[in-house]
């Protein structure tokens, strides 16, 4: 006998929510899914009327669902937001060029303006070119740093007040695990924040912070949303993949593990004696940075000098001496070659 929707008790249930275990029909699931995101937005006071909000759009399921739901809620509850799709072209053949076609279709479907910024125009390099230089081991370091800055630069071009991204509950729980394993205190404290960037960068918020990835997939499937599902060709080597596998194993045993990990990260406190990085600005490009040179400028300098490992890992003492173009002794030259090769 078909199971009836536990909400309306009228229509046949088509799914069992991974997050709550409730059996729901499509319409009740859509409403519950959207209302939970609305409640997150309202309780965290993410937006204010009249703000220009950039939606980080990659063409993937998360950003596509985010764009769709933001448009729905903006109209349903009269948020009064000016929504804009903001995409980054990393220059990955066979992946980003195809996904950007999806973003362009989303632009037409949702009737939202679209701005695309590229690594090539901003940095003079594509990810394909970078991978040829650095190999597959550290490519995600470059992409993560450049992508974050590219979104901010695109937002500045458009006068955007806030950027919202499609980071979901699974993503945040994975990040908590990664930062805990790396002992990264600064990131461990702020990775669960629903809004970041109060130090001077354009604020970023995560409306999908408490939304399970499985439910995002179900929403996109039943809504028949147009999204790109191919994984980045360079990501299988990413460190995040190990945290993801571990998280999925935990979720299989205890479905609430995802939210539990997020709440654990939120409740972690940092000892007052621990020195936290002080945010300033990069002396070269003006971007927010806790060092005299931002990470993007250090990475770019290494690429342009033919020393791609220059900005990888903790900064060597010689890095800034090289970047400031100070002469090196023979001993320093030998040490530098050992570090960057």
Curated annotation (Swiss-Prot):
Q: Name one Pfam family in it.
A: ATP_bind_3
Q: Which GO terms describe its cellular component?
A: cytosol; cytosolic tRNA wobble base thiouridylase complex; mitochondrion
Q: Does the keyword Transferase apply?
A: yes
Q: Does the keyword tRNA-binding apply?
A: yes
> Biological process GO annotation list?
protein urmylation; tRNA thio-modification; tRNA wobble position uridine thiolation; tRNA wobble uridine modification
The molecular function GO annotations come to: nucleotidyltransferase activity; tRNA binding
Record pathway? tRNA modification; 5-methoxycarbonylmethyl-2-thiouridine-tRNA biosynthesis
Q: Which UniProt keywords apply?
A: Cytoplasm, RNA-binding, Transferase, tRNA processing, tRNA-binding
Question: What subcellular locations does the record give?
Answer: Cytoplasm
- Could you say which EC number(s) this protein's record lists? 2.7.7.-
Q: Where is the signal peptide?
A: none
Its biological purpose is as follows: Plays a central role in 2-thiolation of mcm(5)S(2)U at tRNA wobble positions of tRNA(Lys), tRNA(Glu) and tRNA(Gln). Directly binds tRNAs and probably acts by catalyzing adenylation of tRNAs, an intermediate required for 2-thiolation. It is unclear whether it acts as a sulfurtransferase that transfers sulfur from thiocarboxylated urm1 onto the uridine of tRNAs at wobble position.
As for family, the record states: Belongs to the TtcA family. CTU1/NCS6/ATPBD3 subfamily.
Question: Under which name does UniProt file this protein?
Answer: Cytoplasmic tRNA 2-thiolation protein 1
Species of origin reads Xenopus laevis
